[in-house]
Amino acid sequence: MKKNLLCAVFASAVFSGSVLADDISGTWKTIDDKTGSSKAILEMRQESNGTYTAKIIKVTPRPGYTPKETCVNCPAPYTNKPILGLDILTGLKAANDNHFVNAKVLDPLTGKIYSGKAKLSANGKRLTLRGYVGVSALGRSQTWIKQD
């Protein structure tokens, strides 16, 4: 009996993380951490395995800047793929209390792939995404604003 109760408590603790995090599916506007301007509009979707993927559905370049049309410097399978429609975030998984982990983030301008984690604001309108290599302290953060 004690063994069954212990298993139930353990299972509850393990699976509660994904229950507590809000659904982040929808349309998001990215805000560049260096310029403060929007770079793109993304569509975030939840995959059948419960992780999230985000693709670029609109490029919003700052005035006077002509964006690249293809992912020239990107590794396979992204090499020379159109940036519009490109999945730039994959594997983002709910952890707990509006925290998300285990993402892979592609920067289509440099072709670099980063590890990523995110935190959703209390009102569900802002997602702060942190991309990094190795240690989170050595990364960059970007804010995404919910559009719908």
Show where each model-derived region lies.
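Edge beta-strand at a domain terminus
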Residues: 126, 132-148
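Cleaved targeting-peptide boundary
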Residues: 21-28
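Sec/Tat signal peptide C-region and signal peptidase I cleavage site
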Residues: 15-21
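Short, compact, well-ordered microdomains
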Residues: 115-117, 122-128, 141
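Central antiparallel beta-sheet cores of small beta-barrel/beta-sandwich binding domains
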Residues: 30-116
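Bacterial N-terminal signal peptides that target proteins for export
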Residues: 1-8
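Short aromatic-glycine motifs in intrinsically disordered, low-complexity regions
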Residues: 74-80, 128-135
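Cleavable N-terminal signal peptides
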Residues: 8-9, 19
